Design a protein with these regions (language model features):
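Structural signal for the C-terminal ends of transmembrane alpha-helices
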Residues: 40-51, 98-107, 147-155, 186-196, ...
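Hydrophobic transmembrane alpha-helices and their immediate junctions
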Residues: 48, 54-56, 304-347, 384, ...
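N-terminal hydrophobic segments of proteins, predominantly signal-anchor/transmembrane helices
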Residues: 2-25, 33-82, 119-121, 167, ...
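Alpha-helical transmembrane segments of multi-pass inner-membrane proteins
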Residues: 91-192
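A membrane-periplasm/extracellular boundary helix in multi-pass inner-membrane enzymes
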Residues: 167-172, 189-232, 249
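Long extracytoplasmic/lumenal interhelical loops at the membrane interface
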Residues: 234-238, 242, 260-308
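Flexible juxtamembrane loops connecting transmembrane helices in multi-pass membrane enzymes
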Residues: 28, 214-246, 250-253, 264-273
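Transmembrane alpha-helices of multi-pass inner-membrane enzymes
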Residues: 36, 338-392
Length: 410
């Protein structure tokens, strides 16, 4: 199977079954099977982008170490370690495999993906309960809008259609989506140049963006991150603030330098196999964190870093610093914005959601890898490279370097 064909099917299945109808399908392992399929497909295909393989090997060695470390520490049962392992490696496997394969798509393939996404969203809205918070529609519309602009953003009318798709996500009523929407509008319409760490204007722009995000999400931000931290006794806090405080204790005090290990804290595995750490830190009586009702145990991504400690935190930052440097090398400004939004959306959702580790975050990692590898270059049916279907930065429209890594098997 051609790489472009494989990824066309992957994208077609992704949004309907990993986001929109994931809870209704009655088949909760489709994202794991899709990830496994992508890994196997990567092994049998000729890949490019080999400069990233050292990073892949480093990550593999690191995860093997953490599996052994977790089994030796034995804070939770071995089953929790392996359940958590498959969830922790998923986003990075998706990113690395997509990066190595660097898929390109024909115009027809792009249209098929986008039409199915729009139809799926419309069908989802038929049974949507308006006025009730629903994170699913926000996540689906945001990713669909980004992909639409990624594929079709060469004309302003397509850019505005992409914005309209993202705007539909406001129906979710979720504060974190309001923050993502502010970020999206700011980067699409306000940002005129790449963010440079040595430029004062960058810090002003970032400051204004953060202020706007906090303003539009203040109610929840204040409840969780201002008033939520005012209790001195962790056991008297709400679930999310208590989880963040305890994560800090685990990382910087009690489990230096490698953390508490896989399957022990703030993850689905720690919920399925109720982690003893929740008794140790007095969290087992907090509403949403109890053994009987623990729906808020896997409530945010960043506290999960407690499982990896200071060392894991270092490698997490190292991974994203490398991605940020790669994003800054993208020559086409609109694609630069999309890649940056993928990264920032993962961070924003990570404060109050575990999409980073779930199937719902797979699209961000795929799209980021495609942006970094120049997958926005369109291929015709006879494999002739067409001009990029994006708005070019007037000063940085050279694409000679971004075409490296095209689908050599298509």
């Amino acid at each position: 199977m051609k790489i472009s064909t494989f990824f066309t099917w992957f994208w077609i299945l992704y949004l309907p079954f990993c986001i929109l109808f994931y809870d209704r399908a009655g088949f909760q392992y489709i994202d794991e099977l899709m990830t496994l399929g992508l890994i196997l497909f990567t092994f049998i295909k000729k890949t490019t982008g080999h400069h990233i393989k050292k990073e892949i090997y480093t990550y593999g060695i690191l995860m093997i170490f953490y599996v052994l470390y977790s089994l030796v520490m034995a804070i939770n049962v071995p089953a929790s370690v392996f359940l958590d392992l498959q969830q922790q490696v998923r986003p990075y496997c998706i990113f690395f495999c997509t990066y190595l394969l660097a898929p390109t798509f024909t115009k027809k393939q792009q249209k098929i993906i986008l039409y199915i996404y729009i139809i799926a969203i419309a069908y989802f809205l038929l049974g949507f309960r308006f006025g009730v918070e629903n994170a699913t529609i926000g996540q689906a519309c945001f990713q669909c809008g980004l992909l639409y602009i990624f594929f079709r953003g060469e004309k302003k009318k397509h850019l505005y259609i992409g914005v309209l798709i993202v705007t539909m996500g406001l129906l979710s009523g979720k504060s974190k989506f309001f923050g993502e929407y502010v970020m999206f509008i700011g980067l699409i319409f306000v940002l005129k140049n790449k963010l440079r760490l040595d430029n004062l204007l960058t810090y002003i722009q970032v400051g204004v963006l953060i202020t706007a995000i906090v303003f539009f999400t203040w109610y929840k931000f204040n409840a969780y991150y201002v008033e939520g931290f005012q209790e001195e006794d962790t056991s008297q806090m709400m679930a999310r603030p208590a989880t963040y405080v305890t994560a800090g204790t685990i990382i910087f005090k009690d489990y230096i330098p490698f953390g508490s290990g896989l399957g022990t804290f703030a993850t689905n595995a720690a919920s399925v196999y109720y982690s003893p750490l929740y008794y140790k830190y007095g969290l087992s009586n907090i509403w949403g964190l109890t053994p009987e009702w623990h729906n808020f145990m896997a409530d945010a991504f960043f506290p999960t870093l407690a499982e990896f400690g200071i060392v894991g935190l270092f490698f997490f930052v190292w991974f994203w610093v490398r991605r940020y440097k790669e994003i800054n090398k993208i020559n086409i400004f609109l694609i630069y914005k999309i890649a940056l939004m993928c990264m920032l959306a993962l961070f924003l959702e990570g404060t109050a959601d575990t999409s980073y580790l779930s199937g719902k975050g797979m699209g961000y990692f795929m799209l980021l890898a495609m942006a970094l590898r120049g997958s926005y270059i369109t291929k015709s049916k006879n494999n002739r490279i067409l001009k990029p279907n994006v708005i070019k930065d007037s000063e940085n429209s050279d694409i000679n370097n971004v075409s490296d890594g095209n689908d050599v098997n298509t």
